[in-house]
């Protein structure tokens, strides 16, 4: 009797686990969901080697273009080119952002605080903090995001 009971329990556990596995494997991966399952998010990634000449520039805003340099579910690196006077309008997102100023001069506003940054400088933006910039001298920013910005890939 005890053996029969253990077999029944084992069978119920197997059925329950099988049902759970099919639920998660059929679950739609929402890359914009900050709680995106690690396994799901890791399935999306760029090639290992990327050459600037092969990467397209995308219009982000007037006078602003971006080039996606590499990504996976947890990280994205984006090169952003600004013309003088271009504005990166104030916005916020759930992603952590760290940016390196590769060239040019920018007036950055982060959470209401304004600073001027030049080539060699950098800044950090915590999740859900309002930030934006004005380009004072044409330049390039190297943005890193965690997790990746699925919206930049057209995945919503």
Predicted regions and their residues:
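Glycine- and acidic-residue-biased ligand/ion/polar-headgroup-sensing regions
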Residues: 94-106, 111
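A short, N-terminal "cap"/entry segment at the start of jelly-roll beta-barrel domains
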Residues: 34-74, 154-156
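Short acidic-glycine-tyrosine-enriched beta hairpin
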Residues: 113-127
């Amino acid at each position: 009797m005890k053996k029969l009971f253990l077999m029944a329990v084992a069978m119920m556990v197997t059925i329950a686990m099988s049902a759970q596995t099919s639920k998660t494997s059929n679950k739609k991966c929402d890359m914009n969901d900050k709680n995106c399952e690690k396994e799901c998010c890791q399935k999306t990634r760029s090639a290992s080697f990327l050459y600037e000449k092969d990467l397209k520039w995308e219009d982000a805003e007037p006078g602003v273009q971006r080039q996606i340099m590499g990504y996976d579910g947890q990280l994205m690196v984006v090169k952003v080119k600004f013309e003088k006077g271009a504005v990166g309008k104030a916005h916020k997102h759930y992603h952590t952002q760290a940016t390196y100023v590769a060239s040019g001069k920018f007036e950055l506003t982060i959470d209401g605080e304004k600073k001027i940054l030049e080539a060699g400088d950098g800044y950090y933006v915590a999740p859900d903090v309002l930030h934006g910039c004005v380009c004072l001298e044409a330049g390039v920013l190297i943005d890193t995001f965690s997790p990746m910005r699925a919206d930049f890939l057209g995945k919503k």
